[in-house]
Amino acid sequence: MIGAIRGFSLEHYVTLFTTKELLHMIGGTLLLAVTVAFLSTLLGTIGAIGSFYAGKKSGQCINFLNQIPIANAEVVTGFSICVLMIVLFGVDKDTYLPLLVGQTVLCAPFAYLSVLPKLKQMDPNLYEAALDLGCNHRQALWRVIVREIMPGITSGFMLSVTLSLDDYFITTYTKPAVFDTISTYVVNATKGARTEIKTALWALSAVIFLVVVLVVIGMNMKAGRRQKR
């Protein structure tokens, strides 16, 4: 019975982890989030490095283009990608490509903004110094630049995962009919779903909250240890 407190029970958690429909939805959502985060972080990092080492006008142009998806409402972005991919390019909506592209367009600018400050904090002479010490361009990039900005890359990846999990509007416009993420499933489940499914989703919310708290605590502890060193 919803709304009546009758003591502590793990019944809803059992329902959550034993219902195949919910497990399939959660697994698909996590796989999508990790894939989108990887692509977004890769594109955001490449864009940030290119913007940092490009000329002033080129850097300003990249920064301006990066602001467009952020300033746009998600509904506009989702509908635009739906029209672009499906109507103009003829991509089948039953594939995952429109969804993958849509969420990457949403997340990549935030990954870019996470990496760029780390580049600005870095000594601008490190790259040239690495070249002078015998590194080629690829070695200087991977062994010096990427290591220096790794905290920003990690932050961009985690932020992209969060944005992908949270997104509803872009997912609604671009997802295949047979696929649901946590956000779209929860919205649909509030419209006449069985009581046990609704309560299992409450349990899922508690699990997500606990995982986020543990991740934040772990990252803060790791950062504190680095500062002590």
Regions found by a protein language model. Give the residues of each.
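Periplasmic/extracellular loop-to-transmembrane helix junction in inner-membrane transport proteins
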Residues: 1-37, 191-196
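Membrane-interfacial helix termini and adjacent extracytoplasmic/periplasmic loops
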Residues: 2-3, 10, 75-107, 138, ...
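Interhelical loop and adjacent transmembrane-helix boundary motif
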Residues: 13-21, 165-227
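Hydrophobic alpha-helical transmembrane segments of multipass integral membrane proteins
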Residues: 23, 27, 31-43, 47, ...
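Transmembrane-helix boundary motif in ABC transporter permease subunits
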Residues: 34-66, 79, 83-87, 141, ...
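Membrane-helix interface segments
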Residues: 53-62, 91-96, 137, 151-152, ...
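C-terminal transmembrane helix and the adjacent membrane-cytosol boundary/short C-terminal tail
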Residues: 55-58, 116-127, 131, 137-144, ...
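Transmembrane alpha-helices
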Residues: 112-115, 122-124, 137-166
